[in-house]
Amino acid sequence: MTHMFTPGPVDVDPEVLEAQAKPMIPHRTAEFNEFFRGTEAKLQKVFMTENRVFQPPATGSGMQEAGVRNLAQKDILSTVNGAFSQRWYQVAIDNGKQADRLDATWGDIIEPDALADALKKKNYEAVTIVHNETSTGVENPLKELAAVVHEVSPDTLILVDAVSSLGGTKIETDAWGVDFILTSSQKCFAMPPACPLDRKSVV
C-alpha cells in the first residue's frame, strides 16, 4: 500500500474501504434513517454541540459557500492568512457579499487584537475564520478569536472552517459560541472524500 503524506485525502483504513463494497442502503428505508440519525448523534460529540449536525452532499468549499450565502446578507469580515482563508474571502465576493479582509502574513496567526480593531471600525453580520490554515499548517487561536467577537461585536456570527482540524484537535463549538462550523471527511476523520459536515446554530 502506498502511503499519502498530504493534509488530505489521507490513508483510509482497509476496513472502511471494504465497507464501501457492500450494497447501498436505500435512503428512504427505516434502516438508513436509523443509521443516518445515529451518525448525527455521534458527530454531535465530535463537534461538542447540542445542535444538529448536517451531512450534506457537497465539498468543504461548498459549505463555505453555504455559510456566506445563508448567514450574511451583505457585510462579512474575512480573516485571511493562507490559501483556504483566501478562498473563503473570494467565495464571499463571488456570492455578491461586501467582504472586507483582515490579513495576516502567511505563516502567522490572526491576532485577536487585530480582529478586535477591525470589528470596532464597522458592523459585520459575520466573520469567517479558518481554524487550521491547511496551506501553512498554522492553527488560529479560535477560542480567543471567538471571545473577541462576543465581546466587541456580539451580533456578528462566527463562521469557522475546520476542514483540517476537527477530529484532530479539541474544538468546543457550543462553549466557544461558534455559530457555524464545517469540516470534511478526508482529513482528520481519515474517511473517503466527499462527505462534508457542518453544525449550524443559526439558519
What are the residue ranges of the model-derived segments?
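Conserved PLP-enzyme active-site core in the AAT-like
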Residues: T6, V10, G38, Q55, ...
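A glycine-/small-polar-enriched, mobile loop at the entrance of the PLP active site in fold-type I
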Residues: T2-P57, S61
